[in-house]
């Protein structure tokens, strides 16, 4: 049976602000990974981090932008493996943003963990996404939005 990671986080910011942290490479790097993302459907990009040999992961996630609905939805493929073009994890990440009276509710769904060999990825990434969303919240809440007294 395929496993799906689902996370929800609420931010005291409008969807447009949260969207920037999902689509601007320099902001994505603050809470996720180094990347060459561009918000263009069909665009191929990469996330880069340290290799994890125990998971047969070379540290590179090969991705393609699948869908963009500005300020509402973003999805991309997320593929990785041990290197040399071998892919052992083939998944999809989907972000949905909903405006609220207090800001934005952000929903993450990371699907496609359907192979037994992907169980360790699923376990690690379930915790990893939660930690990354907490990092995003930290950066969003300390970013200089609005006006200052200067």
Task: Indicate residue ranges for each PLM-predicted region.
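Generic structural detector for well-ordered beta-strands
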Residues: 8-12, 38, 46, 64, ...
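A conserved amphipathic terminal alpha-helix motif
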Residues: 112-150
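Short hydrophobic/aromatic-rich beta-strand segments that constitute the beta-sheet cores
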Residues: 45-47, 73-77, 106-108
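Short beta-edge strand/loop motif at the mouth of beta-sheet-based domains
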Residues: 6, 26-60, 149-150
